[in-house]
Amino acid sequence: TRQRAKTELGSRTVDQVIAALVKWTKALNRADPNFEHQRLEALWLHQVMNVANEPLLNEILASTEPRARAAAVRVHCYWRDRVNQPLDTLAKLVKDPHPRVRLEAIRSLSFFNTSKAADIALESVELPQDQYLKYALDETMRTLERFK
């Protein structure tokens, strides 16, 4: 069960967990219908262990599964100070074809202390917006207005 897994992982060192996790992740079968979810679980465990794995993050950000991409954008936000060119990545993600991915990217931009983040967020209006995207954009712009 999940609780037993959490207990077991908690009894191990970070190095032990990450070594086993990397091995497990490499052995995942791309043909498995749960492949994207399993990679997300690996990404989330890296996050719990406070070990950024930018290559895995970037792979999931490029996934064909929009829910996986959206979840990875949330992790990207938490790791924004630990990944390369986070604003460049978010500039691509605010134009993602899936609205949930765009919403997460817009929300993520609110955590940056720069006017460039506001400029990137505004690029999202080039694609259709629902009430949730509009709300996220309004809140992000309100947060970033002090950096203009």
Predicted regions and their residues:
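Alpha-helical segment of the N-proximal tetratricopeptide repeat
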Residues: 1-14
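Hydrophobic core positions within HEAT/HEAT-like alpha-solenoid repeats
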Residues: 6, 22, 40-43, 58, ...
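Alpha-helix N-cap/helix-start positions at coil->helix boundaries
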Residues: 33-36, 66-67, 84, 97-100, ...
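Extended, hydrophobic alpha-helical segments in both membrane/secreted and soluble proteins
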Residues: 68-79, 86, 90, 99-108, ...
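Amphipathic alpha-helical scaffolding segments comprising HEAT/armadillo-like alpha-solenoid repeats
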Residues: 14-29, 50-62, 81-94, 114-125, ...
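Alpha-solenoid HEAT/ARM repeat scaffold
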Residues: 2-3, 37-40, 70-71, 88, ...
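Boundary/linker segments of alpha-helical solenoid repeat arrays
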Residues: 129-137
